[in-house]
């Protein structure tokens, strides 16, 4: 989907964490510090800019994906249907959704150019374990774009489980797609649809690897 591609392209500008500090650092400070490193790498690395598949995916795998709570994200996107899925179905669904976002994050990273990120003051108490980190993406042309994250703290530190661009949450956007596929073919039908989409994306250059209608 074109809208989801925009979601991920913007979110990738700031979506990154670091394991060594994940449990100790404030969530907004953590995102700000590490996102700067990822953004600078994406801008300066010619191989990434050219869409070098292995290099881009390696960056996504090491800097972004370990600190996204994919199981929680998948469960929320699946809604009430998640409870009806078997453990094996839940595992397969989470794996395919994760792979879909791997391709999408990677495609977005290869297109990062002149964007910068500005973070807003964190509205949370020190003891809070579920917060919203607010930011905006500044572009050379056009108005700033609001970009917020829902971040929860668990045993292994802070992890993102939802993203908001222009007032719409990513999980809610996928929820409609998931429900439509489930209504047609059940949980297995959704897993197959995601698997087929991932196979299709794997055969394309990174700069086109994003879900489309």
Regions found by a protein language model. Give the residues of each.
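Bacterial N-terminal signal peptides
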Residues: 9-16
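Sec/Tat signal peptide C-region and signal peptidase I cleavage site
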Residues: 17-23
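Surface-exposed, polar/charged faces of alpha-helical domains
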Residues: 25, 40, 44-55, 84-88, ...
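Low-complexity, intrinsically disordered terminal/linker segments enriched in charged
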Residues: 162-213
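Early exported N-terminus immediately downstream of N-terminal targeting peptides
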Residues: 24-105
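Short beta-strand edge/turn micro-motifs at domain boundaries
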Residues: 144-172
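Surface-exposed, charged secondary-structure patches
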Residues: 103-145, 197-213
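Bacterial N-terminal signal peptides that target proteins for export
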Residues: 1-8
């Amino acid at each position: 989907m074109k809208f989801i591609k925009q979601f991920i392209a913007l979110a990738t500008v700031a979506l990154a964490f670091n394991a060594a500090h994940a449990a100790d650092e404030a969530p907004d400070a953590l995102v700000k510090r590490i996102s700067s490193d990822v953004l600078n790498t994406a801008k300066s690395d010619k191989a990434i800019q050219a869409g070098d598949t292995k290099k881009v995916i390696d960056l996504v795998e090491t800097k972004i994906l370990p600190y996204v709570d994919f199981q929680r994200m998948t469960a929320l996107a699946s809604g009430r249907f998640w409870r009806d899925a078997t453990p094996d179905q839940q595992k397969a669904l989470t794996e395919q959704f994760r792979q879909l976002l791997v391709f999408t994050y990677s495609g977005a990273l290869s297109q990062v150019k002149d964007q910068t990120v500005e973070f807003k003051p964190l509205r949370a108490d020190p003891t809070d374990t579920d917060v919203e980190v607010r930011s905006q993406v500044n572009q050379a042309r056009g108005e700033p774009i609001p970009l917020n994250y829902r971040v929860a703290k668990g045993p292994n530190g802070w992890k993102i489980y939802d993203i908001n661009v222009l007032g719409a949450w990513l999980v809610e956007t996928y929820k409609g797609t998931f429900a439509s596929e489930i209504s047609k073919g059940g949980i297995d039908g959704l897993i197959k649809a995601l698997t087929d989409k991932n196979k299709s994306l794997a055969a394309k250059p990174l700069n086109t690897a994003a879900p489309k209608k």
